[in-house]
Design a protein with these regions (language model features):
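Structured soluble/peripheral alpha/beta segments that form catalytic or ligand/cofactor-binding pockets
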Residues: 1-337
């Protein structure tokens, strides 16, 4: 069941749960707590806002994230024609990025010397912008660009507040037609809103100390407009609706009980993903992989994101959609945070 949009995720210390028609105007999970409990909960709160870019010649994802004891930003690009993967990453003091609880009408900013990433959100159905200005490093060329996103051009959003075994989760996801360009070294990638998309992923969640998930997303613009899916499998499951859905032009249809199965142990093995009801049944063929591994005293991350092509079927309420080589990503997170 889709609930009406609440004005705030938390009101008078009471949090609202469910699937919403659209994002609450104010999303601050810490408002459910006060005093010392709020300060302690802040250390468990993980917030990020990122985009997966869909373009025929480019795979790319970018993110601003704040774990409150540490903040960071990352971007990678993979030039399909040249077969070149480039990555930039930056760390900062926890709390230093600007990730306002009122997303629309606000700016999300991460800036460090030689690294600037800005998301400027207009009205919910207005125009949003991604701007990046990143200097060259020893391992990657400079990256510059600006994309304009059509807030009214995609399907309805996925907006979910759920109870998870380790703590509550909130996410807001949406498909946006994208216009503009990104330059990577001497290569320029021009985005056409009739063909190309940016998939928004906003998360504000109290993740458990030991965290594991498998997640995937993909989208393309078909004859009926944008079509795609977002799907996840977590250790321990969830008592409330999860963040899985099928996107069509008119709906973000709930999707539950999704399974992930690699076809081998190889780092670029194909994966099969399917839902128990058969509405999602796809095979993902990776074209490349980004790995992140960190080992600290009390914290560790073992993460990879595969980028590649999805083939299979999506069965929405309207019809069955056949997918052939649709671009997207699949990731695995194993962490102590």
């Amino acid at each position: 069941m889709i609930e009406p949009q609440p004005s705030s995720l938390v009101s008078e210390y009471v949090r609202t749960y469910g699937r919403f028609e659209s994002r609450p105007q104010l999303v601050n999970p810490l408002e459910a707590f006060a005093g010392m409990e709020q300060r302690l909960r802040q250390l468990r709160l993980k917030e990020w806002i990122g985009f997966t870019l869909i373009h025929p010649e480019l795979y790319s994802s970018l993110v601003i994230q704040d774990a409150h004891y540490l903040a960071s930003s990352e971007i990678y690009t993979f030039d399909r024609r040249r077969g070149e993967l480039y990555e930039h990453a930056s760390n900062a003091r926890g709390g230093s990025p600007t990730l306002p609880p009122e997303l629309f009408g606000s700016e999300c900013v991460y800036t460090r010397p030689g690294y600037e990433l800005v998301y400027a959100f207009g009205a919910e159905r207005g125009t949003h912008r991604i701007s990046l200005d990143i200097a060259a490093s020893r391992r990657a060329p400079a990256m510059h660009g600006e994309l304009s996103l059509d807030g009214g051009g995609g399907p309805p959003p996925l907006s979910v507040s759920s109870r998870l075994p380790g703590g509550p989760m909130y996410t807001h996801k949406r498909l946006y037609p994208a216009r503009g360009s990104i330059r990577v070294g001497d290569s320029e990638f021009v985005f056409d809103p009739a063909r190309d998309l940016a998939i928004l992923d906003e998360h504000r969640s109290f993740l458990p100390y030991q965290t594991r998930w498998l997640w995937g997303t993909f989208a393309h613009i078909g004859l009926d407009g944008p079509v795609g899916a977002n799907f996840i499998s977590r250790a321990g499951g969830a008592a409330d609706p999860e963040e899985s859905c099928i996107w069509t032009r008119h709906a973000a249809e709930p999707l539950d009980d999704v399974s992930f199965a690699p076809q081998s142990a190889g780092p670029l093995s194909p994966w099969r993903m399917w839902s128990a009801d058969g509405r999602l049944d796809v095979v993902f063929e990776p074209d490349g992989r980004k790995d992140v591994r960190h080992q600290l005293l009390l914290a560790a991350i073992d993460y990879f994101q595969l980028f590649g092509r999805y083939t299979g079927t999506l069965r929405s309420a309207e019809r069955t959609h056949t997918l052939r080589g649709v671009h997207g990503v699949c990731e695995c997170m194993l962490a102590r945070l």
